[in-house]
């Protein structure tokens, strides 16, 4: 499926009918918390994984995908591992989760239809958005990998969300922070902009990572979303 050329900010509404936001790392600053829980829980089951590897291997992936990964390596995890992980993450979120700075202002002022599509299960998405005060902005517009046969990097979730929202793939923009999410959006025939404003990209070259995955542009602050700028696609973080 052919995607139209990358638009300027002034052309956004003309080019797009729908913006799909990923949740973790885009709407909420959750990836460090989630990956810390994963590393700690795996350690309890005698599986060693450092935080950087957790970002690289599992950012944007579902709990089922994580279990399948280790099963494929011959490392069996308990049948209730996914439930254990979600319980640990929920506790961490209740204590420490915050929304990405300025994302609420962006959403309230956005003049394009939008929704959220995440690899997380519906209960976790709902809880995360409620904790951060964003839940009311997505009423009836929440889509989970639970709804489709294959999660990211397969295109199923984004295609499902776009279809439910009445938008064609080529007129849909996806905002993603993970390699698997970028790959899923491109496989769906959608435009994708990488977001590197989450805490998990503080010491990583997020621009290079997401551009290599196929992202059309990369930005690091929600206040920059959709603004015409000569340095769109350039990582202004000096590392």
Regions flagged by a language model, labelled:
Residues 2-56:
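Active-site neighborhood of HAD-like aspartate-dependent phosphohydrolases
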Residues 1-17, 108, 112, 121-239:
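Asp-based, Mg2+/Mn2+-dependent phosphohydrolase catalytic module
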Residues 44-48, 73-76, 133-137, 166-167:
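Short helix-capping segments at alpha-helix termini
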Residues 26, 118-120:
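Conserved phosphate-coupling serine/threonine residues in phosphotransfer and NTP-handling enzymes
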Residues 41-42, 62-76, 128, 162, ...:
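Helix-loop "lid/cap" segments that line or gate small-molecule binding pockets
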Residues 33, 58-62, 98-102, 120, ...:
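Short beta->alpha linker loops
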Residues 35, 39, 55, 63-68, ...:
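An amphipathic alpha-helix signature
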């Amino acid at each position: 499926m052919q995607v139209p050329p990358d638009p300027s900010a002034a052309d956004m509404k003309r080019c797009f009918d729908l913006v799909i936001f990923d949740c973790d790392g885009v709407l909420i600053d959750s990836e460090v918390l989630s990956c810390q829980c994963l590393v700690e829980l795996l350690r309890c089951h005698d599986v060693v994984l450092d935080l950087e590897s957790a970002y690289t291997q599992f950012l944007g992936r579902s709990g089922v995908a994580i279990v399948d990964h280790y099963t494929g390596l011959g490392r069996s995890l308990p049948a209730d591992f996914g439930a254990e992980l979600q319980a640990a993450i929920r506790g961490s979120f209740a204590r420490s989760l915050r929304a990405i700075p300025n994302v609420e202002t962006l959403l309230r002022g956005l003049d394009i239809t939008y929704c959220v599509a995440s690899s997380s299960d519906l209960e976790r998405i709902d809880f995360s958005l409620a904790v951060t005060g964003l839940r009311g902005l997505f009423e009836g517009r929440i889509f989970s990998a639970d709804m489709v046969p294959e999660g990211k990097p397969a295109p199923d979730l984004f295609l499902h969300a776009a279809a439910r929202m009445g938008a064609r793939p080529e007129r849909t923009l996806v905002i993603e922070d993970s390699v698997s999410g970028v790959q899923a959006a491109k496989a769906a025939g959608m435009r994708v902009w990488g977001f590197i404003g989450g805490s998990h990209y503080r010491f990583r070259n997020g621009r290079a990572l997401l551009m290599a995955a196929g992202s059309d542009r990369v930005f690091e602050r929600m206040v920059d979303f959709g603004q015409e700028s000569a340095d769109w696609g350039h990582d202004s973080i000096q590392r």
